[in-house]
Amino acid sequence: MQKFTLLKGLVAPMDRENVDTDAIIPKQFLKSIRKTGFGQNLFDEWRYLDAGFPGQDPKSRKPNPDFVLNQPRYQGASILLARKNFGCGSSREHAPWALDQYGFRAIIAPSYADIFFNNSFKNGLLPIVLSEIQVSQLFDEAAAFPGYALTIDLERQVIIKPDGKELPFEVQAFRKYCLLNGFDDIGLTLRQADKIKAFEAQRLAQKPWLARTLLA
């Protein structure tokens, strides 16, 4: 998992409440047995005017010119600004995968669905919670200033605005540690590889019949 330390990125404002996971990555694109390739179908039904199918070349699609991510001023955005209850709906880890693979590293919103919130941290995506007033101010500024960018300093837990003003945010210490070091669940487990191997060696030495049972 990619480390998250300091991010300076263009902001894309998605002015919708209750954006659910089926809007983030529609169900027809979940059939892949791989963890990659979901970014091209992020917000698919809003992003394109025609219906798509898995494996389709996005260059053959008809983009919706009114959708925020298709507007030239927001191309290359790495910070998504959203409204309350972002990521609601059915549980699917593909949602943070799609956001990450599109290029987003962080989301700023007043609130999130719990499962989406947890899945985001586990996949290297930082979901920041600010008050509705603060989020509305950011929406106003993003609309008023083309090229509006923010800096997110995870170590200090602050968002730095273009004028230098800082917005503090909260993040649980363990989640912060994992993001700063790029540790997902597998990475955390592998840090204990030597201890796991030592335990297994000791267990098999004490109970050798278990090995015979497993090999039978």
UniProtKB/Swiss-Prot annotation:
The gene is leuD. Keywords: Amino-acid biosynthesis, Branched-chain amino acid biosynthesis, Leucine biosynthesis, Lyase. One of its GO terms (cellular component) is 3-isopropylmalate dehydratase complex. Pfam families: Aconitase_C (PF00694). CDD domains: IPMI_Swivel. Catalyzes the isomerization between 2-isopropylmalate and 3-isopropylmalate, via the formation of 2-isopropylmaleate. Pathway: Amino-acid biosynthesis; L-leucine biosynthesis; L-leucine from 3-methyl-2-oxobutanoate: step 2/4. GO terms for biological process: L-leucine biosynthetic process. Signal peptide: none annotated. One of its GO terms (molecular function) is 3-isopropylmalate dehydratase activity. Its EC number is 4.2.1.33. InterPro entries: 3-IsopropMal_deHydase_ssu, Aconitase/3IPM_dehydase_swvl, AconitaseA/IPMdHydase_ssu_swvl, IPMI_Swivel, LeuD. It catalyses: (2R,3S)-3-isopropylmalate = (2S)-2-isopropylmalate. Heterodimer of LeuC and LeuD. This is 3-isopropylmalate dehydratase small subunit. It is an enzyme of class 4 (lyase). Belongs to the LeuD family. LeuD type 1 subfamily.
